Curated annotation (Swiss-Prot):
Localization per record: Cytoplasmic vesicle, Secretory vesicle, Acrosome membrane; Cytoplasmic vesicle, Secretory vesicle, Acrosome lumen
Organism the protein comes from: Rattus norvegicus (Rat)
Entry protein name: Spermatogenesis-associated protein 31
Entry keywords, A to Z: Cytoplasmic vesicle, Differentiation, Membrane, Spermatogenesis, Transmembrane, Transmembrane helix
Tissue specificity note: Specifically expressed in testis by haploid germ cells.
Length: 1048
C-alpha cells in the first residue's frame, strides 16, 4: 500500500511523457479499470438481467425500474477520471447501499415475476427447502416485522390510492386491466429478513411470511394461495381465518374490482378489502397441513401454464395501511347527517360489501345454525330477464379448540344496500342452486373443472378426515370449477360479467353471448322487504338523500346502475320523446279523469323532459256546440261539429269520428292554403316550433244576453293540457259581426287565420258568428306546478268611446230597458248581414291611428260615418238590439279639441241668451261668467244651465239667424257629433294635447243633449262674438295656452 502512491505517480508521469509505450500503457490501464468496474457491479447487473421484458411490462411506473445505481454510475463516470478521492467515495456509498439495493431487488415486481422456481427459491433461501415450514411457522416473525414497518414512498402510492379507491369502492372494471403503483415497505431496523411488499394486480414473490396458516386443501391451477394472504395482525380477512378449504379456494378464484369495494375504515387508507373480523387466526390441525402440502406443491409447479393476463389479475395482494392519512370518506363532507349516523352508515356499507363480494352456492351458506335465521337473512337471486347479482353471503365462524369442525354462518344483517344497497332484496335465501354453467363462445371451460374434480377425489381418498361434509365438497367443486375455467380462459368471473350484461342490455350490444342457467328452480318465494326495517336509525328524508347521492355516483361512473334506473333508460332508448304519439280527445268527454300510459309518463318524469306533443283536453261542464280544435303539424285532429238546431241545448258533446276528422283535415288544409300572408307566416312559425294551438270554442247561445263560457287552460305537466269551462260570465269585445252561416259549417278562413292574431269566434243563436279580437293568450306551461291561464279579454278604445257616447235618447226607455241596452251596446256591435268584413289587421289599426293626426279634417276611406236620422220609432222597447255603425277612429288629441270647441260653443250660446235678456243694455260692458272648462268635459252642462235656456225673445240679426237655421236644416246631411250630458262633473283633460286645427262647431241645444254640426267654412255673424271667436281659434294653435275665464 505504501508503494501505491509512488506507483501511481510513476504511471502519471509516464502517461504524460511522450514515450513510445504511452499507448500500450493506456490500453492496459483501461482494461484493468473496466474489469474492476465489471466485477464491482456484477451483482447489480445480474439482478436486472434476470427479469424478462415481458415481466417488466407489468409495472406501470418506469421509475421503479430506474434504481439509484444508474445515478451513481453517471457520477462515477464523470468524477473517477478526474479525482481518485471521488473513486473511493463512490465505492463506500455503493457498499453502504448494497444491502438496501438487494432488498429493493427482491421487492421489485419484475424480479418476482421471473418464474415460480426463482420466486420460491428467493423467498425461502434462508430456510429449509425440504419442507414448507415457512408457510406455517412464521407467524410471530411476521407480526414483529409488520409492527416496525413504515411507508417509505408516500408520493408514489398516495397519489394513486385515492384515485383507485373510488374505483375499488364503486366496482369499476378499470382495475381489471390497470394496476396500482407499488408501495415499498422498509423496516426501521436492519433485519436480514425483508418485510413483505404489497402490490395490486401484480404478483409479488416475497418469501412466504405469515401466509394464512389456513391453506385450502385444493388449489386451482392458477393460484399459489400462500403468496396472497400477507396481512397485518389487526386486519385479518375473515373468510381466511381458517374456514373450510372451500372458502379459501373460492375466495381467491376471482380477483375482481367488485370484490374490492368491500372496504372497511382501514381499507379506505390503502384501497384494499378487509373484513371487520379482528379475531385471531386459529392454528389448523395436522391433518389439514398434511393434505394441503402436496396440493400446494402441485399447484405451484403448474403455475407457468397459465396465461400472463391471469397471472397479472389473479395475484392481487390484499394489504392495508393502518394509518388514516389517506382516508377517503364514503359520504361527502356536506352530507346532512350527524357523525353518529355517518359512522353507522359506513359500517353498514362496509358489512354489505364484504357479504356481497363472493358468489357461493346457497349450500355453502346453510348449516344447522343458520336454518333458524332464514327470515332475517337476505339472499341474492338471479332472474334471466332481470339481471341482478346472485351473490351469496357468508362469514366465518369460530373453530372449536380441537379444530375438528368448521362452522358456517351468515351475518344477521345482510343485503343492506345503498341504491341497490338501500333498495330491495328477496326476503328468503336462495335454495337449490347447485351449479351455474356458463357457456362462452369459442371457450370450453369444462376440462379444468373435470381435472380439478379428479384431483380432489384422489386426494380425498387418501385423507381420512371426517370434519368436511361431502355435500359441501360437491357443491364447492361445481362452483369452483366454473370460476377456475373462466380464469384460465382469461375471462372475468361471473360477478363482473353480470354487471357488464346489465349495462350492455341498456346501452350497447355485447360481443360475448352468455347464457346462465339454474339447474334447480328457486323454491323460495320472491318476497321483498324495504331497507327501512334495516336502517331504522335514519329518517325518510335522510334515507332518500342518501339514495340519490349513491345513485348519482353510480350513474356518473356508468357502472353498477340500480335496476330501477335500467328500465326507464331502456324505455327511453326504445321510445324517444319524438316518437311519442299525440293524444287528443282519446277519452270520452264524460270522463273527468285522464288515464296516462305508464311507459311514456315514467320516461318523461324520470328524464325531466317535457312532452309538448301530448295534449289531453278535459271538459268539466261542456256547453252545447263546443269546438275543440287543435292545429298541429304532427297531427291534425277533427273538430267537434255543431249539433243540429233541435239539440242546441243538450249538454252532451260528441267526439269526432273518422269521416268528420278527414273532412276537417281537408278543410284545415284548404284554409291553410288560402291564409293571408301575415296569418300564414304565424301559422308557419307554429308548424316549425311544433307548438300546439288551442283554439277557443264555438258556443251557441239562445240570445245575445247569454253569457259566454270562459276558456281556462290548466296545465299540470308539460305533456298534459286540460281545458275546463267555468260558469262565470265573460265580457267579450266585439269588433266585427260576420254574416249567418250554417250551423254544421266549419270555421271559415278568417277564423283560422285570426287565431294567430288572438281572435275568438262565438256563435250567436240568431244573428250568426260574432268575431272578437281579444289578446292572444300564451299557453306557456311550467313544470313546477299547476298554472291556470285565463283567456284575457280585450276592450279597445273604440268600444270605450262607444260606451261613453250614446246616439239614442236614453230618457225614452225605462231604467231596466236602459241597463239592458247599455250592456248590449257595450259588448255587442253588428253590421249589415249582407256584407262580410275581414278582421282589421295590425297595420290597419296603426294606419287608422296615424292618419287622423295628419289629416284631421279629411275623412279616412272606409271610416265614413253616415248621418243617422232621428227616428223616434226605432228606439222603442220592443227593439232590444240596435244597429250601430262602427265609430271612426280618432286620436285623443282630436277628441279633446272637439270637446273644447263644444265648450266654447256653449259659452257662446250662453252669451247669446244673456244678450237676448239684456238687449236694452247693449252699450254696457258685460261680464262673461266662468266657463265650464275646468269643471265639465265632453261638452256636458249642468241641469240648471239647461233649464235657463229659452228661445230668443228679441229679433236678432237676420243674416246670423238665417245661417243658424240653415245649419240646423242641414244637420242630417253633415257629419255630426252627439254628446250626452252627464250629471257628474268631469275634469277636463290636459289642453296641451288638443289638436290645433279643429273646426269650430255651432251649438244647437236640445232637451238632453247638444248636437254640434261640423261646419268648417261657416261662422255666425254675431257682431259682438265674431271677434271673440277668432281669438279662440287663434289661441288653439298654441297647445301650451290655458283657457282662463274671460270677461267681455
Amino acid at each position: 500500500m505504501e508503494n501505491l502512491p509512488s506507483l501511481l505517480e510513476s504511471i502519471y508521469t509516464t502517461w504524460l511523457s511522450l514515450s513510445s509505450t504511452i499507448w500500450a500503457m493506456d490500453m492496459i490501464l483501461a482494461f484493468v479499470c473496466g474489469l474492476g468496474l465489471y466485477l464491482l457491479l456484477l451483482p447489480f447487473l445480474e439482478s436486472h438481467l434476470s427479469s424478462s421484458p415481458s415481466d417488466i411490462n407489468f409495472t406501470r411506473k418506469p421509475q421503479i425500474q430506474m434504481t439509484w445505481q444508474s445515478q451513481y454510475m453517471k457520477k462515477f463516470r464523470n468524477h473517477c477520471r478526474n479525482d481518485a478521492k471521488a473513486w473511493e467515495e463512490c465505492l463506500k456509498k455503493l457498499k453502504e447501499k448494497e444491502k438496501d439495493e438487494l432488498f429493493l431487488e427482491e421487492m421489485s415486481p419484475g424480479h418476482h415475476l421471473n418464474s415460480l422456481g426463482n420466486m420460491f427459491n428467493s423467498a425461502s433461501a434462508k430456510q429449509d427447502s425440504t419442507t414448507l415450514s415457512p408457510f406455517w411457522n412464521l407467524k410471530e416473525k411476521s407480526e414483529e416485522q409488520m409492527a416496525t414497518q413504515k411507508l417509505s414512498y408516500p408520493k408514489i402510492s398516495g397519489d394513486h390510492l385515492q384515485e383507485k379507491y373510488d374505483q375499488l369502492y364503486w366496482g369499476l372494471p378499470s382495475l381489471h386491466s390497470e394496476s396500482l403503483v407499488a408501495a415499498a415497505w422498509i423496516p426501521q431496523t436492519t433485519s436480514t429478513l425483508p418485510s413483505p411488499f404489497f402490490l395490486f394486480n401484480v404478483i409479488s414473490s416475497v418469501y412466504p411470511i405469515h401466509l394464512q396458516d389456513k391453506m385450502s386443501p385444493v388449489l386451482p391451477h392458477t393460484h399459489p394461495l400462500s403468496y396472497l394472504d400477507l396481512q397485518p395482525p389487526p386486519l385479518i380477512l375473515s373468510p381466511l381465518e381458517f374456514q373450510s378449504p372451500a372458502l379459501n379456494q373460492v375466495h381467491f378464484q376471482s380477483p375482481l374490482p367488485v370484490l374490492l369495494p368491500s372496504s372497511l375504515p382501514y381499507s379506505r387508507d390503502s384501497g384494499a378489502c378487509y373484513s371487520q373480523s379482528q379475531s385471531k387466526p386459529h392454528c389448523p390441525t395436522t391433518e389439514i397441513q398434511y393434505r394441503e402440502r402436496p396440493l400446494v406443491t402441485k399447484q405451484l409447479e403448474s403455475r407457468l401454464t397459465l396465461p400472463l393476463m391471469v397471472q397479472k389479475d389473479a395475484y392481487s395482494i390484499l394489504a392495508s395501511n393502518p394509518s388514516h392519512d389517506w382516508a377517503v370518506p364514503i359520504f361527502p363532507d356536506n352530507f346532512p347527517i350527524s357523525c353518529e349516523l355517518r359512522d353507522k352508515l359506513e359500517q353498514h356499507i362496509q358489512k354489505w360489501f364484504i357479504q356481497h363480494q363472493w358468489y357461493f352456492p346457497p349450500e355453502i351458506q346453510e348449516s344447522e345454525e343458520v336454518m333458524g335465521l332464514q327470515n332475517s337473512v337476505t339472499g341474492n337471486y338471479q332472474i334471466r330477464d332481470q339481471p341482478c347479482t346472485s351473490q351469496a353471503h357468508m362469514s366465518t365462524g369460530e373453530h372449536n379448540k380441537q379444530g375438528q369442525k368448521v362452522k358456517f354462518q351468515l351475518e344477521n344483517e345482510s343485503c343492506k344496500n345503498l341504491g341497490p344497497i338501500l333498495g330491495k332484496g328477496p326476503k328468503d335465501p336462495v335454495k337449490g342452486l347447485e351449479k351455474n354453467v356458463v357457456k362462452v363462445q369459442g371457450a370450453n371451460i369444462l376440462e379444468p373443472e373435470r381435472n380439478l374434480v379428479k384431483h380432489f377425489k384422489s386426494d380425498s381418498r387418501n385423507d381420512s378426515s371426517n370434519y368436511i361434509d361431502e355435500d359441501l365438497e360437491n357443491n364447492w367443486k361445481a362452483n369452483f370449477g366454473t370460476k377456475s375455467g373462466q380464469i384460465n380462459q382469461g375471462l372475468t368471473p361471473l360477478s363482473m360479467r353480470q354487471s357488464w350484461l346489465a349495462m350492455n342490455d341498456s346501452f350497447c350490444d355485447t360481443d360475448i353471448h352468455m347464457e346462465t342457467r339454474n339447474l334447480t328452480a328457486i323454491k323460495s318465494s320472491e318476497k321483498f322487504m324495504c331497507s327501512r326495517e334495516k336502517l331504522a336509525f335514519l329518517n325518510p328524508e335522510t334515507r332518500q338523500t342518501l339514495e340519490e347521492h349513491v345513485v348519482r355516483f353510480w350513474v356518473k361512473h356508468r357502472w353498477g346502475l340500480p335496476l330501477k334506473m335500467l328500465k326507464p333508460i331502456n324505455l327511453f332508448k326504445l321510445k324517444s320523446t319524438e316518437s311519442l304519439p299525440l293524444t287528443l280527445c282519446t277519452q270520452p268527454s264524460s270522463t273527468n279523469s285522464v288515464h296516462r300510459t305508464n311507459s311514456a309518463v315514467e320516461v318523461v318524469r324520470f328524464l325531466g323532459k317535457p312532452c309538448l306533443r301530448q295534449i289531453i283536453i278535459k271538459d268539466s261542464s261542456p256547453p252545447p256546440g263546443n269546438l275543440l280544435l287543435v292545429s298541429s303539424p304532427s297531427c291534425k285532429r277533427a273538430a267537434i261539429r255543431r249539433p243540429p238546431s233541435g239539440v242546441d241545448h243538450e249538454p252532451s258533446v260528441a267526439l269526432p269520428n273518422k269521416p268528420q276528422s278527414a273532412y276537417l283535415a281537408e278543410t284545415l288544409a284548404y284554409n291553410f292554403m288560402e291564409t293571408p300572408t301575415q296569418s300564414g307566416g304565424v301559422l308557419k312559425d307554429e308548424m316549425e316550433t311544433e307548438e300546439v294551438l288551442l283554439l277557443p270554442r264555438m258556443t251557441c247561445a239562445p240570445n245575445l244576453r247569454a253569457h259566454n263560457p270562459q276558456a281556462k287552460v290548466v296545465s299540470e305537466y308539460p305533456y298534459n293540457v286540460e281545458t275546463e269551462l267555468t260558469g262565470q260570465p265573460q265580457i267579450y269585445t266585439t269588433s266585427v259581426l260576420l254574416p249567418k252561416h250554417s250551423r254544421s259549417m266549419p270555421l271559415p278562413v278568417d277564423t283560422l287565420t285570426s287565431n294567430a292574431l288572438g281572435d275568438i269566434v262565438m256563435v250567436d243563436g240568431g244573428n250568426g258568428l260574432v268575431q272578437q279580437r281579444p289578446s292572444t293568450p300564451k299557453h306557456q306551461v311550467s313544470q313546477k306546478g299547476q298554472i291556470k291561464m285565463l283567456v284575457p279579454t280585450y276592450q279597445g278604445e273604440d268600444t270605450k268611446r262607444q260606451s261613453e257616447r250614446k246616439y239614442e235618447d236614453m230618457s225614452k226607455f225605462s231604467p231596466v230597458t236602459e241597463r239592458k241596452n247599455n250592456f248590449e251596446n257595450q259588448y255587442y256591435q253588428t253590421l249589415p248581414k249582407t256584407t262580410q268584413v275581414l278582421p282589421e289587421s295590425l297595420f290597419q289599426r296603426l294606419l287608422s291611428r296615424f292618419l287622423p293626426r295628419v289629416h284631421p279634417k279629411k275623412t279616412i276611406k272606409g271610416q265614413e260615418c253616415h248621418p243617422q236620422k232621428d227616428n223616434p220609432t226605432a228606439a222603442t222597447a220592443q227593439n232590444q238590439r240596435r244597429q250601430v255603425r262602427k265609430q271612426p277612429y280618432m286620436d285623443d288629441n282630436v277628441t279633446e279639441a272637439q270637446k273644447l270647441m263644444t265648450t266654447v260653443g256653449q259659452m257662446l250660446e250662453k252669451k247669446m241668451m244673456q244678450h237676448q235678456h239684456h238687449a236694452s243694455k247693449v252699450n254696457q260692458p258685460r261680464v262673461v261668467p266662468p266657463g265650464p272648462t275646468s269643471w265639465f268635459s265632453h261638452g256636458h252642462m249642468p241641469v240648471s244651465c239647461l233649464k235657463r235656456r229659452r228661445p230668443p225673445s228679441y229679433p236678432a240679426n237676420s243674416l246670423c239667424q238665417r245661417r243658424y237655421i240653415q245649419g240646423r236644416h242641414n244637420r242630417g246631411q253633415l257629419p255630426q257629433k252627439s254628446v250626452q250630458f252627464s250629471q257628474k262633473p268631469q275634469i277636463l283633460r290636459n289642453p296641451r294635447h288638443m289638436y290645433p286645427k279643429s273646426a269650430l262647431n255651432v251649438v244647437n241645444s236640445s232637451q238632453n243633449r247638444t248636437t254640434v254640426p261640423r261646419t268648417p267654412n261657416q261662422h255666425l255673424c254675431c257682431p259682438r262674438h265674431c271677434a271673440f271667436q277668432r281669438n279662440v281659434c287663434r289661441e288653439l294653435g298654441h297647445p301650451s295656452v290655458a283657457f282662463p275665464n274671460r270677461k267681455t
